[in-house]
Amino acid sequence: MKYSDLRDFISQLQQMGELKRINMPVSPYLEMTEICDRTLRAEGPALLFENPTGHTIPVLGNLFGTPQRVALGMGATDVSELRKIGHVLAMLKEPEPPKGFKDMLGLGSLVKSLWDMTPKERRDAPCHDIVWEGNDVDLARLPIQHCWPGDIAPLITWGLVITKGPHKKRQNLGIYRQQVIGRNKVIMRWLAQRGGALDFREHSIANRGQPYPIAVALGADPATILGAVTPVPDSLSEYQFAGLLRGSRTELVKAIGSELRVPASAEIVLEGHIYPDESHPSGYEHALEGPYGDHTGYYNEQDTFPVFTIDRITMRRDPIYHSTYTGKPPDEPAILGVALNEVFIPLLQKQFSEILDFYLPPEGCSYRMAVVQMKKAYPGHAKRVMFGVWSFLRQFMYTKFIIVVDEDVNIRDWKEVIWAITTRVDPTRDTTLVDNTPIDYLDFASPVSGLGSKMGIDATNKWPGETDREWGTTITMTPEVKKRVDQIWQELGI
């Protein structure tokens, strides 16, 4: 299914019984978090809070609270179809010469589809229906959630941050949380390795002393939102990929105060700059961010990040504010990880044909632990796969633990994974520790902020060269006996 904008998606979710409208007044301060958390854990619907306490703008929560709704947002009808998207991305990342006429036609069709999905720029747009400028710019007028009791301030969570580096042809889309610190100021928390931070760093070197323009889109269409969290090849625009998911070109409009292009159908757009401040070593305004409850289930440490000053807020008529919360798994990021896991698999298999399956357990905070099922071919093969996964996609840079198992182990069943670890692993021989690697800043378990270690666990059967002992043989029943018992099972009355 395809959706022209967020409102179209909401309408179709409601028809499918996947969205619940809440008419009762509910406060953005803590109450929405508790309601959304209970609903997500029950695999319930998306929630549209129509009367947030103290505000007239409705709040949309739990939008991607089930893998099925993530799949719907990506234009699929079921989670199983997401692997097709992964196959497309794998081909775009590393295209192969066509093996025959049929392959050539297929490749040509995909290239044409991508060309046809070049974003379309409009002269006017719904997101410019209403414009707040000057003293009218006041974030307190938006129903921004205060998610947890220990959070320092309200937090913008689902903002699609749009940036552009001075030497890049295309814009970057990323989702970074933003702490409200004033009527027109937020702290832009982006890690140094993320696209937005890299764009800003390039600007601060090339154009030091010049304000850095940013736009933040709230309530874009689902394909554009999900395109921003998908491992799109660097050569492909997230807007272009969103068009491919949607089946129609992404419509953009020029921001009023900069050259950035924003989604024309976005519900709300924040426009502004990171302004110079020579009192900070970077030459730009910074502030201390946090603490906030995050996807680890803990409150994180404070750290310093750039301040984004909002010069204007534009919006559609009767806008909808899209929000979420992060907390101990499962939360929305964990659910997104479950769905995007299916997109990752073809990408990994394209690079490492020995990988049969790949799983990011949601309990592992979306990406901190990965389990890999492989077809082992030689001694030490599992270690090659570990380092391959760590280095292949940016998404796995922060994966702390990788467990590798053989093809006879179902990696989505923890009972089988634990059985493999406890019967096939010698802790000294089969664990690989790597020091001083990039780690999520939110991971307070690391000895240094942003830098820590990783562990690989080889839970495969060991081959000659890996052990001098005779390796155990797995116990299995004969096929003949299984078939016989299948035939008489009903008669046994068990």
Curated annotation (Swiss-Prot):
* InterPro entries linked: UbiD, UbiD-like_C, UbiD-like_N, UbiD_bacteria, UbiD_Rift_dom
* EC number(s) reported in the record: 4.1.1.98
Task: Provide the assembly information.
Answer: Homohexamer.
Give the disulfide map. Answer: none
**UniProt protein name:** 3-octaprenyl-4-hydroxybenzoate carboxy-lyase
What are the protein's UniProt keywords?
Cell membrane, Decarboxylase, Flavoprotein, FMN, Lyase, Manganese, Membrane, Metal-binding, Ubiquinone biosynthesis
Cofactor(s) needed by this chain: prenylated FMN; Mn(2+)
Q: Where is the active site?
A: 294
Q: Name one Pfam family in it.
A: UbiD
Question: Where is the major localization of this protein?
Answer: membrane
Positions binding Mn(2+) in this chain are: 172, 238
**What species does this protein belong to?**
Herminiimonas arsenicoxydans
Functionally, this protein is described as follows: Catalyzes the decarboxylation of 3-octaprenyl-4-hydroxy benzoate to 2-octaprenylphenol, an intermediate step in ubiquinone biosynthesis.
| Involved pathway(s) | Cofactor biosynthesis; ubiquinone biosynthesis
Q: Where in the cell is it found?
A: Cell membrane
Gene3D superfamilies named among the record's database cross-references? Single helix bin (1.20.5.570), UbiD C-terminal domain-like (3.40.1670.10)
Q: Name one GO biological process term.
A: ubiquinone biosynthetic process
Taxonomically, the superkingdom here is Bacteria
Q: Which reaction does it catalyse?
A: a 4-hydroxy-3-(all-trans-polyprenyl)benzoate + H(+) = a 2-(all-trans-polyprenyl)phenol + CO2
- Per the record, GO CC terms? cytosol; plasma membrane
Identify the taxonomic lineage of the organism of origin.
Answer: Bacteria, Pseudomonadati, Pseudomonadota, Betaproteobacteria, Burkholderiales
One GO MF term: 3-octaprenyl-4-hydroxybenzoate carboxy-lyase activity
Q: How is the cofactor bound?
A: Binds 1 prenylated FMN per subunit.
Which family is it part of?
A: Belongs to the UbiD family.
For membrane topology, the record states: Peripheral membrane protein
Write out the residues that bind prenylated FMN.
175-177, 189-191, 194-195
